[in-house]
Amino acid sequence: MKLLHLDASILPEDSSVSRTLSAAVVAHVRALQPDLTVTRRDLVAHPLSHMTLANLPPDHPASVPGNEVERAESQAVLEEFLTADIVVIGAPMYNFTIPTQLKSWLDRVLVPGRTFKYGPEGVKGLVEGKRVIVALSRGSFYGQETPYATAEHTETYLRTALGFIGIATPEVIVAEGVSRGEDQRAAAIEAAHQTVAALRV
């Protein structure tokens, strides 16, 4: 079984909630699945450039010859995603949405003809049988009962993007309010770890 582990926090693991949680998810899955092969992609330590026609994966219909090194890397990112059985994404909320580093990764993964296709009846996702677990951190509270509910564009964006390519039910583990005092931070992290511990393979 292959697992792809992505992190997009600009903070180091000892101070990043999303990195800590994504690492906990990977460790938990590894304990339950000893034959697991893990590929790690740190999107901050090794960022992908923003999307251009010249660095799209060659499989993308809009791709044109350009930076062949980046095109090859983009193709490798796509294949890495497609061959993984499980994808674990560590994603903090930055300014109400996902980090740009994670957006650049998604731009390599949402590829017409490979992960989705258009047809007379609309869009059809082509990614089947893949499990995605998102470890998400938010500094404040963005639930439906809060004044900031409409400002939540991290979980909603990821659910939309993943659903678009056929991953209709990603598992999202949220540590919320982690910037609202030490007690709240500790409680949110503990609750998230309990959710991680309940994951089944």
From Swiss-Prot:
Note accompanying the cofactor annotation: Binds 1 FMN per subunit.
EC number assigned by the record: 1.6.5.-, 1.7.1.17
Domain of life of the source: Bacteria
Keyword list, A-Z: Flavoprotein, FMN, NAD, Oxidoreductase
Pfam families linked to this entry: Flavodoxin_2
GO MF annotation: an example: oxidoreductase activity, acting on NAD(P)H as acceptor
Needed cofactors: FMN
Binding site for FMN: 9, 16-18, 93-96
Catalytic activity: 2 a quinone + NADH + H(+) = 2 a 1,4-benzosemiquinone + NAD(+); N,N-dimethyl-1,4-phenylenediamine + anthranilate + 2 NAD(+) = 2-(4-dimethylaminophenyl)diazenylbenzoate + 2 NADH + 2 H(+)
HAMAP family the record matches: Azoreductase_type1
Family affiliation: Belongs to the azoreductase type 1 family.
Annotated function: Quinone reductase that provides resistance to thiol-specific stress caused by electrophilic quinones. Also exhibits azoreductase activity. Catalyzes the reductive cleavage of the azo bond in aromatic azo compounds to the corresponding amines.
Subunit structure as annotated in this protein's UniProt entry: Homodimer.
Protein name: FMN-dependent NADH:quinone oxidoreductase
